[in-house]
Amino acid sequence: MYAIVRSGGRQHKVAVGDIVEVDKISTAKVGDTVELSTLLVVDGDAVTSDPWVLDGIKVTAEIVDHHKGAKIDILRYKNKTGYRRRQGHRQQYTAIKVTGIPAAAK
């Protein structure tokens, strides 16, 4: 059984026990439980994508860690003028462990 969930404007395919890296959830601390909105549930041959059915289904997950991703270098360069700008960015992520995917009602 797996589900497609939405977190931080992105979609992730998750199953029970998976550890997934999502954009930082700033309101939660390590060890807290969060609920993620479900877009699709696949249970064997049964596929549930009806928004009316999935409205009540929330995937539960536990916060494992808050960390930063790899450094990304942003370089701007204009030819023949000597204009150069360098900037770096490290995205903040939250690692979550999926603890439960409720079965969709038929």
UniProtKB/Swiss-Prot annotation:
- State if Ribosomal protein is listed as a keyword: yes
Record family assignment: Belongs to the bacterial ribosomal protein bL21 family.
GO function terms (MF aspect): rRNA binding; structural constituent of ribosome
Protein name listed in UniProt: Large ribosomal subunit protein bL21
Taxonomic path: Bacteria, Bacillati, Actinomycetota, Actinomycetes, Kitasatosporales
Q: Which HAMAP family match?
A: Ribosomal_bL21
Q: What's this chain's function?
A: This protein binds to 23S rRNA in the presence of protein L20.
Q: Which domain of life is it from?
A: Bacteria
Query: Which residues, if any, are the signal sequence?
Result: none
Single biological process term from Gene Ontology: translation
Which SUPFAM superfamilies does the protein's record reference? L21p-like
Keywords of the record:
Ribonucleoprotein, Ribosomal protein, RNA-binding, rRNA-binding
Report the GO terms under cellular component. Answer: cytoplasm; ribonucleoprotein complex; ribosome
**Subunit note:** Part of the 50S ribosomal subunit. Contacts protein L20.
